[in-house]
């Protein structure tokens, strides 16, 4: 029997489940089970679809406006979740930076965006204004720290898109 569930931040959100032959369930586990039961209701997915479409529209609009202001759009992290985002939004990224040599010198599926090493950060001019889109959104802080360590342009921007679109400096 499920007697506890612990929410963790791994991969956006994961759970550790505690099982026991006893059957006394804490209130937060009962609440979690009640919340999970909503996954059987199509209305849950209709609301979710509207939320996702809103994030997409805001992200595309934000990136388009920054591109009009002369910003270069560069992705970081060729994670599967990022490829899903790109194929849904069709963001016109110049390239995607990834630290994994097995992904470098390849192209993103569907969008055919070149995947390059982080050495390309050294080739950017000091005058280049860049909007970085961390495609592995759950590693936003780590990706941002890597970029800032190599490049410190006060005009650069970083865009979060989950759970909402937010531009950071």
Task: Put a short name on every predicted segment.
Residues 72, 95, 130-131:
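Structural motif
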Residues 66-87:
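Glycine-rich adenosine-cofactor-binding loop
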Residues 84-96:
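Substrate-recognition/cap helix-loop segment adjacent to the acidic, metal-dependent catalytic center
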Residues 50-69:
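A short, well-structured juxtamembrane/interface segment
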Residues 1-11:
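Conserved S-adenosyl-L-methionine
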Residues 112-169:
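Phosphate-bearing ligand-interacting subdomains
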Residues 94-108:
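NAD(P)-binding Rossmann-fold cofactor-contacting core
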Residues 11-51:
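Flexible, glycine-/basic-rich loop-and-beta segments that form/coincide
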């Amino acid at each position: 029997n499920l007697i506890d569930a612990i929410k963790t931040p791994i991969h956006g959100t994961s759970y550790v489940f505690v099982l026991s032959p006893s059957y006394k369930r804490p209130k937060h586990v009962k609440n979690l089970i009640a919340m999970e039961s909503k996954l059987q209701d199509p209305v849950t997915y209709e609301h979710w679809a509207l939320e996702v479409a809103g994030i997409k529209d805001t992200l595309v609009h934000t990136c388009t406006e920054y591109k009009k202001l002369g910003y270069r759009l560069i992705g970081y992290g060729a994670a599967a979740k990022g490829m899903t985002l790109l194929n849904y939004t069709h963001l016109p990224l110049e390239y995607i930076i990834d630290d994994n040599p097995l992904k470098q010198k390849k192209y993103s599926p569907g969008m055919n965006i070149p995947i390059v090493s982080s050495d390309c950060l050294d080739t950017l001019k000091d005058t280049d204004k860049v909007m970085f889109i961390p495609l592995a959104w759950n590693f936003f802080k780590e990706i941002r720290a890597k970029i800032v360590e190599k490049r410190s342009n006060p005009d650069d921007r970083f865009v979060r898109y989950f759970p909402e679109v937010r531009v950071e400096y």
